[in-house]
Curated annotation (Swiss-Prot):
One of its GO terms (molecular function) is structural constituent of ribosome. Binds to 23S rRNA. Belongs to the universal ribosomal protein uL23 family. This is Large ribosomal subunit protein uL23cz/uL23cy. Keywords: Chloroplast, Plastid, Ribonucleoprotein, Ribosomal protein, RNA-binding, rRNA-binding. Its main location: plastid. It comes from the Eukaryota. One of its GO terms (cellular component) is chloroplast. It comes from Piper cenocladum (Ant piper). The gene is rpl23-A.
Length: 93
């Protein structure tokens, strides 16, 4: 899982699951083709569309020094009907 950082669980991403669309944050340097190839290879699914947007890092302040966190990219991956990605969360006991 080089390119994908983690799966996003927001109200919008949960709503998109009904349309067979999965939302995840990926490395900002990753391209759509890399992520599409990786998802198809790793999960054995067929990707028909990908939407992405770049999110700015949040501002951070440490005393007089002002900085920011890293930028990242969010991908919305649409799969062909009949395919699905299994949940990536493991239950902790």
């Amino acid at each position: 899982m080089d390119g994908i950082k983690y799966i996003v669980f927001t109200e919008k991403s949960i709503r998109l699951l009904g349309n067979n669309q999965y939302t995840s944050n990926v490395e900002s340097g990753s391209t759509r083709t890399e992520i599409k190839h990786w998802v198809e290879l790793f999960f054995g699914v067929k990707v028909i569309a990908m939407n992405s947007h770049r999110l700015q890092g949040k501002g951070r302040r440490m005393g007089p020094i002002i900085g920011h966190t890293m930028h990242y990219r969010r991908m919305i991956i649409t799969l062909q009907p009949g395919y699905s990605i299994p949940p990536l969360i493991e239950k902790r006991t």
